[in-house]
Amino acid sequence: MEAKAIARHIRVTPMKARRVVNLVRGKQANEALAILKFAPQAASEPVFKVLQSAMANARVLADRDGVAFDDSDLFITEAFVDEGPTMKRFQPRAQGRAYRIRKRTSHITLVVATPEKEEAR
């Protein structure tokens, strides 16, 4: 069984979010939650929420299909961060100049699956 969760337009730069996602890629879901809970990076909070959502989606799919479900069976099979739209702002500077400030956003995607699905690939 495979479940997916996506968070779009998250106000964190993709590079910083990728640092956090790389920490949990391939890990067991409950272990990843523990890692994210104590990670000092600000991007760990949205990744934590996406992982919780993916686990909840897996639970709903299992209930719908009538399959036995256990959180400890889930592993993160795919985890990636794509760049979202960039908000452009201007910072006034001396002598009539202006610097462009780019406020970057991210799309965070996590896929969790049970080991049977992982072996079938």
UniProtKB/Swiss-Prot annotation:
InterPro entries: Ribosomal_uL22 (IPR001063), Ribosomal_uL22_bac/chlpt-type (IPR005727), Ribosomal_uL22_bac/org-type (IPR047867), Ribosomal_uL22_CS (IPR018260), Ribosomal_uL22_sf (IPR036394). GO terms for cellular component: cytosolic large ribosomal subunit. The keyword GTP-binding does not apply. GO terms for molecular function: rRNA binding; structural constituent of ribosome. The keyword Amino-acid biosynthesis does not apply. CDD domains: Ribosomal_L22. GO terms for biological process: translation. Keywords: Ribonucleoprotein, Ribosomal protein, RNA-binding, rRNA-binding. Belongs to the universal ribosomal protein uL22 family. This protein binds specifically to 23S rRNA; its binding is stimulated by other ribosomal proteins, e.g. L4, L17, and L20. It is important during the early stages of 50S assembly. It makes multiple contacts with different domains of the 23S rRNA in the assembled 50S subunit and ribosome. HAMAP family: Ribosomal_uL22_B. Part of the 50S ribosomal subunit. This is Large ribosomal subunit protein uL22. It comes from Paenarthrobacter aurescens (strain TC1).
